[in-house]
Amino acid sequence: MCIGVPGQVLAVGEDIHQLAQVEVCGIKRDVNIALICEGNPADLLGQWVLVHVGFAMSIIDEDEAKATLDALRQMDYDITSA
């Protein structure tokens, strides 16, 4: 099963690779933002994104992020491995 995990954008790169540092349940990881970045990457700072296999797939609001994280925890899904 493929599951996207919510993460919050902490920092964005300024190079061609379109990477951002995203925090997922306390773990920071580099995520490609090319699929969701339509303007200035700095506009994504603080936003919640849905992460799947190293890519930010969509921007979500904080309520949706928290609800998704809660649901994943209830399923005993290992959020940190996503």
Swiss-Prot record:
GO molecular function, one term: carbon dioxide binding
GO biological process: protein maturation; protein-containing complex assembly
Disruption phenotype: Deletion of the gene abolishes the generation of active hydrogenase 2, but only reduces hydrogenase 1 activity. It does not affect the maturation of hydrogenase 3. Deletion of both hybG and hypC completely abolishes hydrogenase activity.
InterPro entries according to UniProt: Hydgase_assmbl_chp_CS, Hydrogenase_HupF/HypC
Annotated positions for site Important for interaction with HypD and the precursor form of hydrogenase: C2
Pathway: Protein modification; [NiFe] hydrogenase maturation
Membrane-spanning segments: none
Pfam families reported in the protein's UniProt record: HupF_HypC
SUPFAM superfamilies: HupF/HypC-like (SSF159127)
Subunit structure: Forms a complex with HypD and HypE. Interacts with the precursor form of HybC (pre-HybC), the large subunit of hydrogenase 2, and with HyaB, the large subunit of hydrogenase 1.
Function, as annotated: Involved in the maturation of [NiFe] hydrogenases. Involved in the biosynthesis of the Fe(CN)(2)CO cofactor. HybG delivers iron-bound CO(2) to HypD where reduction to CO probably occurs. In complex with HypD, accepts the cyanide ligand generated by HypF and HypE, and also coordinates the carbon monoxide ligand. Involved in the maturation of the hydrogenase 2. Also participates in the maturation of hydrogenase 1.
UniProt family annotation: Belongs to the HupF/HypC family.
Name listed for the protein in its UniProt record: Hydrogenase maturation factor HybG
Species whose genome carries this gene: Escherichia coli (strain K12)
